[in-house]
């Protein structure tokens, strides 16, 4: 059963760095059709190999996110995230093309081009970071473009954001909805899950990933619904099928059914990193908990360090 997974050892970022440049490869090198990498804060980059089936699954999980966000083939998807070794641009584009939306692969930055294409191509959805979304909202407001664009939705991710920050760009752009997308290079890239219109937690693809939540100190499972470190096992990846990979991201599994009615399981939004935790008077404190308190005060802005 899936409970037997707990008998297997953990894997970690060190396993990927130790096997550089193509770590933990489980197929013949001739079967690898592409690589992606994450930017390492120290040492060498983590390079992950992909077979053609892996690329197809990457496209599938992103296409599912577009469907969950309520997009149709009539939508126009502007991609304003990084390309190259980073997975984001490739994933957003693969998913958009598989889904069947008109794809506009702009890349990050170049705010003038972003604004021009929003107007000229009547983009209905854009994929970007939360900080880029806020910048776009401010520039649209500054140039009085709100009545000239058709933007309805934003799918954002890859960096922390506050609730107030999200509310700010949603209101400034007059969006119908904004969606927080989850992902990590070790599990294809973006698209491992997305929040629904209810917005509580992230629906994730349980046929592609098995998620455990553990105590980062004891390495034992936490009680149901409690916050701990997310550990992910790939159920479909061919080239580098990571088993019990310690993400060091803090989250929780949400046991209750989602009010949206979907049977897709959920995990909570990422609350921080297990290595960011501090212990104050015997209590574990995480950055996400401090952010939750700050969000209770209307006079506190959405951008802080």
Annotate each PLM feature.
Residues 67-101:
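Conserved AMP-binding loop of ANL adenylate-forming enzymes
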Residues 35, 62, 93, 166, ...:
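Generic structural marker for isolated residues within well-ordered, non-membrane alpha-helices
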Residues 64-67, 94, 138-142:
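Short, well-ordered alpha-helices that flank and scaffold nucleotide-derived cofactor binding pockets
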Residues 54-55, 81, 102-106:
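Short, flexible loop segments at the rims of nucleotide/cofactor-binding pockets, characterized by
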Residues 32, 55, 82-84, 131-132:
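Short glycine-enriched loops at secondary-structure junctions
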Residues 1-37, 42-60, 64-68, 72-74, ...:
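Nucleotide 5′-phosphate-binding alpha/beta core
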Residues 99-305:
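Active-site glycine/GP-rich loop and adjacent strand/helix microenvironment
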């Amino acid at each position: 059963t899936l409970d037997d997974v707990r008998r297997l050892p953990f894997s970690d970022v060190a396993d990927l760095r130790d096997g550089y440049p193509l770590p933990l490869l489980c197929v013949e090198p001739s079967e690898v059709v592409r690589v992606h990498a994450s930017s390492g804060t120290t040492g060498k980059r983590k390079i992950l190999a992909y077979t053609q089936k892996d690329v197809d699954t990457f496209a599938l999980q992103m296409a599912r996110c577009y469907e969950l966000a309520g997009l149709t083939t009539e939508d126009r998807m502007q991609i304003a995230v990084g390309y190259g070794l980073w997975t984001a641009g490739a994933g957003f584009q693969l998913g958009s093309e598989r889904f069947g939306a008109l794809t506009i692969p702009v890349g990050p930055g170049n705010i003038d081009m972003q604004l021009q294409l929003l107007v000229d191509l009547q983009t209905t959805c854009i994929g970007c970071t939360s900080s880029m979304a806020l910048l776009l909202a401010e520039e649209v407001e500054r140039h009085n473009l709100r009545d000239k664009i058709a933007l309805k939705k934003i799918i954002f991710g890859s960096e922390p954001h506050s609730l107030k920050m999200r509310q700010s760009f949603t209101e400034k752009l007059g969006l119908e909805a904004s969606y927080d997308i989850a992902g990590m290079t070790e599990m294809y890239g973006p698209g491992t899950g997305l929040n629904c219109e209810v917005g509580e937690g992230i629906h994730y693809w349980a046929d592609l990933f098995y998620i455990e939540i553990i105590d980062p100190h004891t390495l034992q499972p936490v009680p149901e619904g409690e916050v701990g470190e997310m550990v992910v096992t790939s159920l479909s990846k061919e080239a580098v099928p990571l088993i019990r990979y310690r993400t060091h991201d803090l989250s929780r599994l949400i046991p209750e059914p989602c009010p949206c009615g979907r049977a897709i399981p959920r995990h909570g939004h990422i609350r921080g990193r297990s290595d960011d935790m501090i212990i104050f008077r015997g209590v574990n404190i995480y950055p996400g908990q401090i952010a939750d308190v700050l969000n209770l005060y209307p006079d506190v802005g959405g951008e802080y360090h």
